[in-house]
């Protein structure tokens, strides 16, 4: 995903800029929800739910789909949740930070909100595995309609398409990304045209817009109707992307895209599929492709495959973005991040995330085999994330004096009921496939919690055994070691304690540099650090300095650049060719008698050993770096 400056999404942006943002948003934000028509109605009438495609049932399902789009996407996300932005950024991590700000620091409620945010992000990655698999598989399954003899080749073709997609990530998407918007726009207009084509033959399908048919469906099917919501929710998968990508395109462009293009075209295509089923109930086997005129079938398969690849690309890029934020906020180990664009901020490639996603997507395609089986696994991660988002929004809005209490209660009652119903409808499919994304989410949640807890234990252990800087320096200056020319920068997590690297340097080299800097890097709970608050320099005597550098969680930390700019703010001048960076690299020793169970200690030690060095993460040049080892028991 490319990062668009916030001003681009403002009401004062030029018309051409707004149009470009709208088209860009259609290509990136709405790819997931735009490919849902490939499988939603097909899944609703699958044998799994035992529904007969008669007149009342078809209108009932269509009514539920339409009003799910209106309630969940239009009212919840577009109208309400997109108002909660963290300096223009959206997404579950940003909302977690907003909700935590309304709570007392260090309180149990703040801790619980953090846990909710981590679990929501974990479910997002589970969604990131299922979405490419089900989307591309559904598109390629059109070959079964066009040429049934090609059925055995559907899975291999899907794997080839997905492999090419993931292999191409390392080259970036800046060039081809410009075509995403127009292609997806063409896709939506094709959906609308096919919908109108079929509606003209059964205009009575328009009755489904009346919510009475949805209510009637519940009255006729009782609790079984709740079970069917597991298929209806497939129509709103991708709704979370509207909020997550708000910082890239601006709320205005996303709202316009939804109101004037995406919602109308989705409504037309679902009604068109319903009209076809009313005329030909046998078409429920694959209502999307059965609704396409025979002459347009192969072009539609190609367009659908392109649309699903674009939807998958948007989600993959989103996974990189969330991973980068999680690294910055200290929830997962540092990984190598490669910037794939010289001109566009936010175009990144994270190899570890890419290859993990490819392996898991391939497992999903091979293990489930078809889109119908994958659909049973799909909804639980999406609905879990939607439910957590609602809870976080309620916590945040509760502290906002501009939100009237009756309105907040209404929001809470309506959307907690809707989200809980959708989540329940999917969680009861646990043995049918819902276990897969939940297992992925649980594994990632465990990794994130272990890393977070392990880092705290490591920090506490270093601080416990450390020497206070304020008492160490006066003693050192009583018998000062030999001073050598240049500047030494010691990276430390705790600015009040003597860094291990300094102790080792004195012990083995017996020298001090002319100027010594104790550098602490902090990631803020906002996307971008304010220019005036990025750097703080305290002189503590005898050419020793305590420097605090702050970055937002959406920024790429560049420590040398931040230090070089210090003189612009009246600070000291750093000559990059005269500066040596010192860092300690801890070796973790697991202990059964400390803070975590031994298996989590060993897991943390493994993660720590394989994490990318902080020096590379902070853009510190290798030829100016000295790393010194230290063994720490946790």
From Swiss-Prot:
Source taxon at top rank: Bacteria
Protein name per its UniProtKB record: Probable potassium transport system protein Kup
Upper classification of the organism: Bacteria, Pseudomonadati, Pseudomonadota, Gammaproteobacteria, Lysobacterales
InterPro entries in UniProt: K+_transporter (IPR003855), K_trans_C (IPR053952), K_trans_N (IPR053951), Kup (IPR023051)
Keyword Cell inner membrane: yes
Gene source species: Xanthomonas axonopodis pv. citri (strain 306)
Subcellular location as annotated: Cell inner membrane
TM ranges: 21-41, 58-78, 110-130, 147-167, 179-199, 223-243, 258-278, 296-316, 348-368, 377-397, 403-423, 427-447
GO cellular component: plasma membrane
Topology in the lipid bilayer: Multi-pass membrane protein
């Amino acid at each position: 995903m490319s990062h668009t400056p916030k001003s681009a999404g403002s009401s004062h942006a030029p018309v051409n800029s707004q149009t470009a943002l709208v088209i860009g948003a259609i290509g990136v934000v709405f790819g997931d929800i735009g490919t849902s028509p490939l499988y939603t109605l097909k899944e609703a009438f699958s044998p799994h739910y035992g529904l007969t495609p008669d007149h009342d049932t078809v209108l009932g399902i269509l009514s539920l789909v339409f009003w799910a789009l209106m309630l969940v996407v239009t009212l919840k996300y577009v109208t309400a949740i997109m108002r909660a932005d963290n300096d223009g950024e959206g997404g579950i991590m940003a909302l977690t930070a907003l909700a935590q700000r309304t709570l007392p620091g260090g309180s149990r409620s703040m801790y619980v909100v953090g846990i909710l945010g981590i679990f929501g992000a974990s479910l997002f990655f589970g969604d990131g595995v299922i979405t490419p698999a089900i989307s591309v598989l559904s598109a390629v399954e059109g070959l079964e309609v066009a040429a049934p003899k090609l059925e055995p080749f559907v899975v291999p073709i899907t794997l080839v398409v997905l492999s090419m997609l993931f292999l191409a990530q390392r080259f970036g998407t800046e060039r081809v990304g410009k075509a995403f918007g127009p292609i997806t726009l063409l896709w939506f207009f094709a959906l609308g045209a096919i919908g109108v084509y079929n509606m003209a033959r059964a205009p009575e399908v328009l009755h489904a817009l009346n919510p009475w048919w949805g209510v009637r469906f519940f009255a006729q099917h009782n609790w079984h109707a709740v079970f069917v919501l597991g298929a209806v929710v497939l129509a709103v998968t991708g709704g979370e992307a509207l909020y997550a990508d708000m910082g890239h395109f601006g709320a205005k462009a996303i709202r316009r895209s939804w109101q004037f293009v995406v919602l109308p075209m989705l409504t037309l295509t679902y009604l068109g599929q319903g009209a076809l089923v009313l005329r030909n109930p046998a078409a429920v086997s694959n209502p999307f492709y059965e609704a396409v005129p025979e002459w347009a079938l192969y072009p539609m398969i190609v367009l659908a495959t392109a649309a699903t690849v674009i939807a998958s690309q948007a989600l993959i890029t989103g996974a990189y973005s969330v991973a980068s934020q999680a690294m910055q906020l200290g929830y997962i180990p540092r990984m190598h991040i490669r910037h794939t664009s010289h001109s566009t901020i936010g175009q990144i490639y994270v190899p570890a995330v890419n290859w993990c996603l490819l392996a898991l997507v391939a497992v999903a395609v091979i293990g489930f085999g078809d889109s119908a089986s994958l659909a049973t696994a799909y909804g639980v991660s999406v609905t879990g994330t939607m439910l957590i988002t609602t809870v976080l929004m309620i916590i945040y809005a509760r502290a906002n004096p501009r939100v009237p209490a009756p309105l907040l209660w209404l929001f809470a009652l309506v959307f907690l009921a809707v989200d809980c119903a959708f989540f329940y409808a999917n969680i009861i499919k646990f043995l049918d496939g819902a276990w897969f994304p939940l297992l992925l989410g649980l594994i990632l949640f465990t990794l994130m919690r272990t890393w977070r807890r392990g880092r705290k234990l490591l920090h506490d252990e270093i601080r416990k055994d450390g020497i206070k800087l304020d008492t160490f320096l006066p003693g050192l200056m009583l018998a000062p070691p030999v001073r050598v020319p240049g500047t030494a920068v010691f990276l430390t997590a705790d600015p009040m304690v003597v860094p291990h690297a300094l102790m080792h340097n004195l012990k083995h080299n017996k020298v001090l540099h002319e100027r010594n800097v104790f550098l602490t890097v902090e990631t803020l709970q906002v996307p971008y650090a304010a220019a005036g608050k990025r750097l703080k320099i305290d002189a503590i005597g005898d050419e020793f300095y305590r420097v605090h550098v702050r970055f937002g969680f959406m920024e790429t930390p560049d420590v040398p650049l931040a230090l070089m700019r210090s003189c612009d703010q009246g600070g000291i001048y750093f000559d990059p060719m005269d500066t040596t960076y010192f860092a300690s690299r801890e070796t973790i020793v697991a202990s059964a008698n400390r803070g975590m169970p031994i298996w989590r200690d060993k897991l943390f030690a493994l993660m720590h050993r394989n994490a990318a060095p902080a020096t590379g993460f902070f853009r510190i040049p290798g030829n100016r770096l000295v790393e010194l080892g230290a063994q720490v028991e946790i």
